[in-house]
Amino acid sequence: MSITRPTGSYARQMLDPGGWVEADEDTFYDRAQEYSQVLQRVTDVLDTCRQQKGHVFEGGLWSGGAANAANGALGANINQLMTLQDYLATVITWHRHIAGLIEQAKSDIGNNVDGAQREIDILENDPSLDADERHTAINSLVTATHGANVSLVAETAERVLESKNWKPPKNALEDLLQQKSPPPPDVPTLVVPSPGTPGTPGTPITPGTPITPGTPITPIPGAPVTPITPTPGTPVTPVTPGKPVTPVTPVKPGTPGEPTPITPVTPPVAPATPATPATPVTPAPAPHPQPAPAPAPSPGPQPVTPATPGPSGPATPGTPGGEPAPHVKPAALAEQPGVPGQHAGGGTQSGPAHADESAASVTPAAASGVPGARAAAAAPSGTAVGAGARSSVGTAAASGAGSHAATGRAPVATSDKAAAPSTRAASARTAPPARPPSTDHIDKPDRSESADDGTPVSMIPVSAARAARDAATAAASARQRGRGDALRLARRIAAALNASDNNAGDYGFFWITAVTTDGSIVVANSYGLAYIPDGMELPNKVYLASADHAIPVDEIARCATYPVLAVQAWAAFHDMTLRAVIGTAEQLASSDPGVAKIVLEPDDIPESGKMTGRSRLEVVDPSAAAQLADTTDQRLLDLLPPAPVDVNPPGDERHMLWFELMKPMTSTATGREAAHLRAFRAYAAHSQEIALHQAHTATDAAVQRVAVADWLYWQYVTGLLDRALAAAC
């Protein structure tokens, strides 16, 4: 049964508009079940074809030229059926994944509304508040909760978009084929159903006639071996023990097939000597969720018989491969607290590795398609929800009713779709040219750490509205720590880059921010190469796409003036997969990044975009910045060429040169990037000349150091543009 919409006196205000997921998760679960039935039918046909093929052609019943042709045709049909199996596994696991996302979002939203309603009840009964104060506090709480719910819906939509290139988890097909019957709906369990009728709890199992096995699948090729019982001969009549023994959970067969026969063994009778187990299992006082031990001992390569209380001790359910028991919860619900069997099969499953994420975008640990029915989402405690809501209210109240955030500016008629050059495939890339003389401290992407690992959130300015939304969704996002934090950090960086003090009104100038599936953050703007406005700093572990020394300069130049293409090329060169691209609605309107778009709202953008981090010289040329930092004030001129012969300052033409480089941005014609780079090169060379004169004539050490830093920066940019223009010729 799908999760219903929360109700209450303030529920509608906290949900509308856009604060509730209207999709029905049951539709996706039911469709996945229908495809599972199709998969079983296809598998039956495939098994029959394989058996007949082996019997007729490999058993020697038919041979010769015609037999070889028929054998080849049947083999081709078998391959097609196997491909169909793979497609069905993809469809089934995707539907279950989407259903899990919808279910989790609804559960989190319901928790938010319930927690807010409890807080409202407290406020309504608080005698210390007058009517106006009570009304203001309740409205603030309702507004913050609505914002949190809208953010949850948006994040769920982003994750759904990320799954459009979905690939099923490893072994998903095998798990689906092993699943013969789904567990009871809405009751997550780790106990594998017993092959026989269990006895009354507290008494030994009464032996009965063994069930004739089907065709058990043994771990090694060959015909199935008749199960060997621990005691040879006729089963011994059980002896009632002095004290009733609680039956233990039977061990799952090594490779599940049809149910294996039960061979009862009473506690007083010693079983036959089994093979030595890989890891002895310590009996637990009572069944409870715990990591699965090594497989229980089994006599030879036959199917494992159910374990009974004996010398080997009770065992918890597990599989020989150490993988989770098949009865796990749907996607996005695997780590909810309060559900029995949370750590089945050994610990909390980690998310997919980088290679998996690049293929599947989001692959939740429980999305293997194993469960046939949903598990009820475990709600976080009301205390946590209430705390999150109070935090949101406090933030919102401190910031006032309205937001003073700047609206941000985007270019006019400078869409990335216009005359967008395509990046070349990896095999067609030219070898990178010789690097600049000093590249000892090149800032390369570090896959071991994401941007949120090394960048404190306090270093990034944030608007009051965005801070309130982040605070309200903090509890719900705790399960996705890492990926969620990187996306949240990237959103704040994008908002800061679009703040009014980072935007001087230059025509067509704007920033795009992107985050990869492994948490790396990269930014790009529409002007020049390696261009960062004076005074702007970028946080650590945030990469500038056009200043990457590893990428051939001709590829960087092709993406000039197209920041969405720039971040795509950067990710492709480093074999990363973009998770989302962030910008304002105007900046993203005519672009198709191929991944989720996160649109910045006007109240997301802070009044000031001042960030603490690296200067522009540190970003584009870390070794030169380090050399400057190590140079004393008395030796600063050693970093510069000799002073110009003409002691008069050069005429400052930067204003006119800047106007010239803006002209190509008014066009959407093919080749505008080349014209823009030529004009930008002239501006960079002139800025370098002025910085050199200022450095030689400065009398104050601090002013001189700033001028030297400017000269080093423009020297690097000029050299980069020279190489880019030469490569374009």
UniProtKB/Swiss-Prot annotation:
<feature type="compositionally biased region" description="Basic and acidic residues">
    <location>
        <begin position="438"/>
        <end position="450"/>
    </location>
</feature>
<dbReference type="InterPro" id="IPR036689">
    <property type="entry name" value="ESAT-6-like_sf"/>
</dbReference>
<keyword id="KW-0963">Cytoplasm</keyword>
<feature type="compositionally biased region" description="Pro residues">
    <location>
        <begin position="256"/>
        <end position="271"/>
    </location>
</feature>
<dbReference type="GO" id="GO:0005886">
    <property type="term" value="C:plasma membrane"/>
</dbReference>
<feature type="compositionally biased region" description="Pro residues">
    <location>
        <begin position="216"/>
        <end position="235"/>
    </location>
</feature>
<feature type="region of interest" description="Disordered">
    <location>
        <begin position="175"/>
        <end position="366"/>
    </location>
</feature>
<feature type="region of interest" description="Disordered">
    <location>
        <begin position="399"/>
        <end position="457"/>
    </location>
</feature>
<feature type="compositionally biased region" description="Low complexity">
    <location>
        <begin position="200"/>
        <end position="215"/>
    </location>
</feature>
<feature type="compositionally biased region" description="Low complexity">
    <location>
        <begin position="399"/>
        <end position="410"/>
    </location>
</feature>
<feature type="compositionally biased region" description="Low complexity">
    <location>
        <begin position="418"/>
        <end position="432"/>
    </location>
</feature>
<feature type="compositionally biased region" description="Low complexity">
    <location>
        <begin position="315"/>
        <end position="325"/>
    </location>
</feature>
<dbReference type="GO" id="GO:0005829">
    <property type="term" value="C:cytosol"/>
</dbReference>
<protein>
    <recommendedName>
        <fullName>ESX-1 secretion-associated protein EspK</fullName>
    </recommendedName>
</protein>
<comment type="function">
    <text>May act as a chaperone that facilitates EspB secretion through an interaction with EccCb1.</text>
</comment>
<comment type="subunit">
    <text>Interacts with EspB and EccCb1.</text>
</comment>
<feature type="compositionally biased region" description="Pro residues">
    <location>
        <begin position="280"/>
        <end position="314"/>
    </location>
</feature>
<feature type="compositionally biased region" description="Low complexity">
    <location>
        <begin position="236"/>
        <end position="255"/>
    </location>
</feature>
